[in-house]
């Protein structure tokens, strides 16, 4: 005769991996927020743990080192930003150059919302590269290359729509955009003003005429 055990009341037991994943996600979110404001070299693990309210032992369950944590932050920010670019650049109901203007306006509003304290995590790390683990270099370059490719595709749409001349090299324009945009973001943080973003955007669109 088989005996059926009574079903326990309440929620089913959680998988032991779930709390670890929750903690990891919290640490990554906290780290991304901090590193859009401060440099990697100036931020210690203790600051991240204090802000996230996570014990140090839990950090090392999720990441082998601060370097491994840094790689996770770059990957998370790259994924977030790629989705942001796609939201604007793949909006086929909007003319291509207007998509780029919408992205710029959204970024401008984001910087204003945070009092110009936050910038670009990838740009911040790029400026620090001389003091960072060498393993970050290729990852950061790959992120910029991805952003440039998405921007080039939007500019190619603009070219096909006759918004910019056929003689323009869209890949080169996209590279130029990101080199200049990162500088404009840096100046906006420095000046606590959207003026550098506006000056750069105006100059870039003038270049396309």
Locations of regions flagged by a protein language model:
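Hydrophobic alpha-helical connector segments
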Residues: 72, 86-118, 170-177
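Hydrophobic alpha-helical bundle segments that form small-molecule/ligand-binding pockets
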Residues: 132-138, 144-173
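Helix-turn-helix
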Residues: 26, 30, 34-68, 72
